[in-house]
Design a protein with these regions (language model features):
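A preference for well-ordered globular domain cores
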Residues: 1-111
Length: 111
C-alpha cells in the first residue's frame, strides 16, 4: 500500500476515534449536569442557573414539562451551580487529556 494512503487512513482513524471520545465526553457532561430536585429533573445550564434567583416566581418547569414548586430557591441554586461547576471542570480536564494525548488511535484510547 502506498505510504501516503497508509498515513491518510491512520489519520482518518485518529479523527474518528477523537470524535467518538469527544461525543462520549459531551454525553457524560450532559448526564452530569442533570439535577433531580423536588421530584423534578432539571438541566444545569448557565442560562437556567442565572434565572433561578433573578425570577420572583418559585415555580419552574422541569425537563419533562412538569411544573415544580421550589421552596428553597437558594438551595436549588447552589445544587445547580455545584453540578454545573463539577461537570464543567471534569469535562475540561478529560478533554485536555484527549487533546494532549499521543496523536494515534491507541494514544487516545489509553487516556
Amino acid at each position: 500500500m502506498d505510504q501516503r494512503l497508509k498515513k491518510a487512513l491512520k489519520h482518518a482513524d485518529y479523527v474518528t476515534t477523537f470524535k467518538n471520545q469527544k461525543r462520549a465526553l459531551k454525553e457524560k457532561f450532559s448526564k452530569d449536569t442533570t439535577v433531580y430536585y423536588c421530584g423534578g429533573q432539571f438541566t444545569a445550564t448557565r442560562e437556567f442557573i442565572s434565572s433561578v434567583l433573578s425570577l420572583r416566581c418559585d415555580i419552574f418547569v422541569d425537563n419533562n414539562s412538569t411544573p415544580i414548586k421550589i421552596k428553597d430557591k437558594e438551595d436549588f441554586y447552589n445544587v445547580l451551580v455545584e453540578a454545573f461547576t463539577k461537570a464543567s471542570e471534569e469535562y475540561y480536564t478529560e478533554y485536555k487529556k484527549i487533546v494532549n494525548s499521543e496523536r494515534t488511535v491507541q494514544g487516545i484510547l489509553d487516556v
